[in-house]
């Protein structure tokens, strides 16, 4: 059963490695579709907010792409895993509260339990989108391998997921990316 709030027409669950461009892609989609039609939901938002409260940290600084956030990343991952083990839908329920737009873009789906929760809760309106980028492209965006982060479940949990409904290649070829976004936007419009 869906939590309180509106029932979406489409839920797109975006996943991908760090610096693959998940936020870039979801923000590009929202800018084309409009914020009145399309909401970007971030599972990391309530996780970081709760973590900041419990650890006396600056929540706003945990939201940006800063060294501040990176210095707490490993412990946040561990803490988030403990929360999910106790209640797999904890963060999922938090992000959908009060969302009124018909299209939901979950920009940071990282675990099978997240996909399962959305599929069980919203059924056929849920689709998975994998954003992929070459290691070289990710490095150009500032990615550096960090042991305990890039080899943790939060980065690798969906590597063997199987058949994603959509795969967006974000290797730096703007024209190719635009073509792919165009196809996805056509699909979104078919659901409105």
From Swiss-Prot:
Pathway(s) of this molecule: Isoprenoid biosynthesis; isopentenyl diphosphate biosynthesis via mevalonate pathway; isopentenyl diphosphate from (R)-mevalonate: step 2/3
- Its predominant location is cytoplasm
Which terms does the UniProt entry file under GO BP?
cholesterol biosynthetic process; isopentenyl diphosphate biosynthetic process, mevalonate pathway; response to cholesterol
Reactions listed under catalytic activity: (R)-5-phosphomevalonate + ATP = (R)-5-diphosphomevalonate + ADP
Any idea which positions bind ATP? 17-23, 141, 171, 180
EC no. given is 2.7.4.2
List UniProt keywords, sorted A-Z: ATP-binding, Cholesterol biosynthesis, Cholesterol metabolism, Cytoplasm, Kinase, Lipid biosynthesis, Lipid metabolism, Nucleotide-binding, Steroid biosynthesis, Steroid metabolism, Sterol biosynthesis, Sterol metabolism, Transferase
Residues involved in substrate binding: 170
Subcellular location field: Cytoplasm, Cytosol
How this chain assembles, per its entry, is: Monomer.
**What is the name attached to this protein's record?**
Phosphomevalonate kinase
The opening ranks of the lineage are: Eukaryota, Metazoa, Chordata, Craniata, Vertebrata
